[in-house]
């Protein structure tokens, strides 16, 4: 996103940047795009940032702090587009502030819709905001939809537009060929090394357990207004086909791409236009595309076995049950993954912990506000799950 704003300064200007506590990255981005405002959620960190920016002759940038200021920035009149990339439950408040003044939301994380579900989409309709997914699989689906459907995202059913099913693909993660015996000894470093994507530690673990795709399954339910029998997840280790749409007349549309997030970011930034970000491969002839993607091999798609990926069925059951179950699942997974990264539990035990906690701690009421969502998330993360893992 930052590189796109740099490359197309005549089209995009960054008004504000918001982060939690990473001063070094914020300073770097301030030099790259010169925002008018920056906000650090932690007040002490904001003071440190302001001091360093003044020393670097960047005292023209106004430094703010706290969640309240983050919400103000996301609703600024001068802002047309808000990119949601913040991690954690805190991301919800600034995004809802942007929605309530009708902003265009570029959704880069899965958890926003996973946590807030129908509440999020209801607010989007109510305030005439719009949503553009940045996540590769959903961006791929979105690109294959008609503009009419895109404009009514989440409000209409697939069948109204002749679509019978959307198909997500999953690489199977870096461990998909590893035997069960060896999984007991898998370390966080081994999970981190993915053959096709460069990802953070948590996302790498979620990829290996297929929880990434699980969250996307839940996200699809709200974003595209689809039922469980209108979504399929297939194993596709080559990571070439990101998603397909199956139409009622028997035709199938697929999105092919190299594993480069810049392609999906460029599409969302310049929606209904096309721009090319630097360092993205292009192909002058059709056969070059075919040879690059297929070569002498076939494109492999297979059923994703829930026996090998038990998190998948647990999540499907949670999404079919209730929104509070989904919030419990997300918090449950975050703490369990953290336990693995800290080497408190074995990798193979992750699905067991998630399943056990889902079946013992799922006793909350259906959330109707952001505060309800935050309360459930807090209860699971700070008390019950930590106790369960510790014992």
UniProtKB/Swiss-Prot annotation:
Its cofactor is Mg(2+); Mn(2+). Keywords: Isoprene biosynthesis, Manganese, Metal-binding, NADP, Oxidoreductase. 1-deoxy-D-xylulose 5-phosphate binds at residues 110, 136-137, 171, 194, 207, 212-213, 216. Its EC number is 1.1.1.267. Pfam families: DXP_redisom_C (PF08436), DXP_reductoisom (PF02670), DXPR_C (PF13288). One of its GO terms (biological process) is isopentenyl diphosphate biosynthetic process, methylerythritol 4-phosphate pathway involved in terpenoid biosynthetic process. It catalyses: 2-C-methyl-D-erythritol 4-phosphate + NADP(+) = 1-deoxy-D-xylulose 5-phosphate + NADPH + H(+). Mn(2+) binds at residues 135, 137, 216. Pathway: Isoprenoid biosynthesis; isopentenyl diphosphate biosynthesis via DXP pathway; isopentenyl diphosphate from 1-deoxy-D-xylulose 5-phosphate: step 1/6. NADPH binds at residues 109, 111, 200. Homodimer. HAMAP family: DXP_reductoisom (MF_00183). Belongs to the DXR family. This is 1-deoxy-D-xylulose 5-phosphate reductoisomerase. It comes from Blochmanniella floridana. The lineage of its organism: Bacteria, Pseudomonadati, Pseudomonadota, Gammaproteobacteria, Enterobacterales. The gene is dxr.
């Amino acid at each position: 996103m930052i590189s796109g704003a740099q490359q197309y300064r005549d089209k995009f200007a960054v008004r504000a940047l918001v982060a939690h506590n990473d001063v070094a990255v914020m300073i770097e981005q301030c030099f790259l795009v010169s925002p008018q405002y920056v906000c650090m959620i932690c007040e002490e960190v904001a003071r440190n940032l302001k001091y360093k920016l003044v020393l670097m002759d960047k005292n023209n940038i106004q430094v703010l702090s706290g969640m309240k200021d983050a919400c103000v920035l996301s609703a600024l009149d001068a802002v047309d587009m808000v990119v949601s990339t913040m991690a954690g439950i805190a991301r919800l408040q600034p995004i809802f502030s942007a929605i309530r003044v009708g902003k265009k939301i570029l959704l880069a994380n899965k958890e926003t819709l996973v946590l807030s579900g129908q509440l999020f989409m209801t607010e989007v309709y109510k305030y005439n905001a719009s949503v553009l997914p940045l996540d590769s699989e959903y961006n791929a689906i979105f690109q294959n939809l008609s503009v009419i459907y895109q404009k009514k995202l989440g409000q209409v059913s697939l069948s109204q537009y002749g679509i019978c099913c959307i198909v997500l693909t999953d690489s199977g993660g870096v461990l998909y060929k590893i035997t069960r015996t060896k999984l007991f000894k898998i370390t966080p470093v081994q999970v981190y090394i993915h053959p096709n994507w460069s990802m953070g530690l948590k996302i790498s673990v979620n990829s290996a357990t297929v929880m990434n795709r699980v969250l996307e399954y839940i996200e699809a339910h709200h974003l595209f207004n689809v039922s469980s029998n209108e979504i399929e997840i297939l194993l596709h280790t080559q990571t070439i086909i990101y998603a397909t749409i199956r139409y009622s007349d028997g035709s199938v549309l697929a999105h092919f791409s190299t594993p480069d997030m810049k392609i999906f970011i460029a599409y969302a930034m310049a929606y209904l236009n096309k721009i090319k970000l630097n360092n993205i491969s292009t192909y002058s002839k059709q056969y070059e595309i075919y040879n690059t993607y297929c070569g002498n091999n076939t494109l492999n798609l297979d059923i994703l076995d829930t026996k090998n990926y038990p998190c998948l069925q647990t999540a499907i059951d949670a999404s079919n049950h209730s929104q509070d179950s989904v919030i419990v699942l997300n918090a449950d997974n975050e703490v369990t993954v953290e336990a693995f990264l800290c080497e408190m539990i074995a990798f193979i035990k992750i699905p067991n912990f998630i399943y056990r906690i889902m079946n013992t701690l799922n006793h909350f009421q259906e959330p109707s506000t952001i505060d309800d969502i935050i309360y459930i998330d807090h209860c699971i993360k700070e008390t019950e799950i930590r106790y369960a893992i510790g014992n």
